Amino acid sequence: RLSIFISDLIKGQNTLHYLRRFERLRNAPREETEAYRFVRLKELLIHCERNVPFYRERFREAGFSSVEFSSLEQLRQIPPLTRQDLQDRWEDIIATSYRGKRLSAGSSGGSTGQPVTYRKDSHATSAGLAAHLVGWSLSGWKMSMKGLHIWGNPTTVNEEWGRVSSKLKARVFRHHKFPAYTLHDGSRLNELYELISGERYDFIDGYTNAIYHFADYLKRNGLSFNHKVKYVLTTAENLHDFQRRAIEDA
């Protein structure tokens, strides 16, 4: 908890607040969590219709009324948000109440081609990290564990990882980083192997395909570690059975 408190101070966020809320909901009866979800979703839809030009237009075209929303089935009326929408209409997707306020840019990993950029405020960043931590805790992961993050597209690595706040956060959480997009280079695969061997990480997390590619490299080259990584957490891409077996065997 102290590490999250320190990270919040460094980055001007409120992760601890959301973490407490999500942990309470995680242990609450299903009926309570479903009721909470519906109330919050309706509030969000009303906010979007009143304050977000893109969604005001989309709801009107779909014949959808946020005020009359009463069933999850009604969401089928709204066309899905696409990558093209995010790229072409990003200014209209920002709520009018947030125009001129400080927003940070985030981006997708770019694993399907061109990364998609989006904007978020400190509340979104804090809530996202809190949800991330609660999700990991379901696997048995603990915040005190030392980990390696195999992640990042060139934009994220070059623009975000070098920031002082990002480096301090990594130190506080004992969470090192390795750029996933460089693993097409055989020398970088060996560099990653030597890093993990030397640092003796408790867990590794990152893109499914990047971690599978590394596991396959270990197998093909007859490489192994002197210590066992306790957890491997994959994300952003589907984990197929053959990939799971390869990662477990490595």
Where are these regions (language model features)?
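A generic structural signal for short, solvent-exposed coil/turn residues
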Residues: G110, S139-W141, A170, D249-A250
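Nucleotide 5′-phosphate-binding alpha/beta core
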Residues: R1-S107, G113-L129, L133-K146, N153, ...
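Conserved adenylate-forming
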Residues: E43, N153-A250
